[in-house]
Amino acid sequence: MSTLVESPVPSNDSQAAAPAAYDPTQKQKSQAKTARIPIKVVAAEKLKKPEWIRVRAAAPGSRFYDIKRILREHNLHTVCEEASCPNIGECFGKGTATFMIMGDKCTRRCPFCDVGHGRPDPLDTQEPENLARTIAALKLSYVVITSVDRDDLRDGGAAHFVECIAKVREYSPDTRIEVLVPDFRGRLDRALHILNSGPPDVMNHNLETVPRLYKQARPGSDYAHSLKLLVEFKKLHPEVPTKSGLMLGLGETDEEILQVMRDMREHNVDMLTIGQYLQPSEHHLPVLRYVHPDTFAMFEREAYAMGFTHAAVGAMVRSSYHADQQAHAAGVN
């Protein structure tokens, strides 16, 4: 486990240790990534994982290695790999994946996330074509497309999303497309205008945690802005289901989670995912509690009582986990 402390003011003492040289062109992971955020992560005793936290390995004879090979051949990334998702064995084994576009270097440094930070490479103009060909080759009926944050782009990457959606529909017209988008902070109006030309079948943007914890968990993001993204998209496309997700175990209370769920419904969010946060490494935010299955069951009951069309709630649930089943249950066919 780890604890959090405010970053100290740099010392003028010549004896103070100098920080490692920072090369923005290189992908920073783990300690290299979190070393420069306002909240520092300090190693401490780990909580013991309870018996209900179990990761499923890929089954013998599954498509796990075949999927990895195809992704590398087409120069594609998945959030499953980059974020060290615990469900990767199960999902790859079943022939499903969440594709991550616009590179593997994020402009943010969220200390819960295992995606690398750095100066992103220029957009790959062949990526929409490569993505569409791969999805067609895999004969996928439902795909999730996500991305790193691209604060370096004037539209946050919205046009690239639209190009990818269009190409996938060209090659696989019956495939349903969910996008899990960044917050487009500072570029929201431009991004929404661009997305208007080619909206997905499901629009997903994760709030991740409660507003009180945004400073430590989502530096560079804003809770109210994320809600605005979801509700403004819904106003433009009332027929498209909207979706958001939360992770538990960062220090939130149950009542804070319930209030976020109410906020989602007040902003016309249709679908919900809630799962247990698992620390990718000792240099990431600590797990402060493992939520009991009974508590997850309570959140699920409350979600349906609030009017969510579908709620996937459980320790190993992730935003894209069984996304096709979630969408089908919410009426996306």
From Swiss-Prot:
Residues 91-309 form the Radical SAM core domain. Pathway: Protein modification; protein lipoylation via endogenous pathway; protein N(6)-(lipoyl)lysine from octanoyl-[acyl-carrier-protein]: step 2/2. Keywords: 4Fe-4S, Cytoplasm, Iron, Iron-sulfur, Metal-binding, S-adenosyl-L-methionine, Transferase. Residues 1-34 are annotated as: Disordered. One of its GO terms (cellular component) is cytoplasm. [4Fe-4S] cluster 2 binds at residues 106, 110, 113. It is an enzyme of class 2 (transferase). Its EC number is 2.8.1.8. It is found in: Cytoplasm. It comes from the Bacteria. Binds 2 [4Fe-4S] clusters per subunit. One cluster is coordinated with 3 cysteines and an exchangeable S-adenosyl-L-methionine. SMART domains: Elp3 (SM00729). Its cofactor is [4Fe-4S] cluster. Coiled coil: none annotated. GO terms for molecular function: 4 iron, 4 sulfur cluster binding; lipoate synthase activity; metal ion binding. [4Fe-4S] cluster 1 binds at residues 80, 85, 91, 320. Pfam families: LIAS_N (PF16881), Radical_SAM (PF04055). It catalyses: [[Fe-S] cluster scaffold protein carrying a second [4Fe-4S](2+) cluster] + N(6)-octanoyl-L-lysyl-[protein] + 2 oxidized [2Fe-2S]-[ferredoxin] + 2 S-adenosyl-L-methionine + 4 H(+) = [[Fe-S] cluster scaffold protein] + N(6)-[(R)-dihydrolipoyl]-L-lysyl-[protein] + 4 Fe(3+) + 2 hydrogen sulfide + 2 5'-deoxyadenosine + 2 L-methionine + 2 reduced [2Fe-2S]-[ferredoxin]. Belongs to the radical SAM superfamily. Lipoyl synthase family. This is Lipoyl synthase. It comes from Bordetella parapertussis (strain 12822 / ATCC BAA-587 / NCTC 13253).
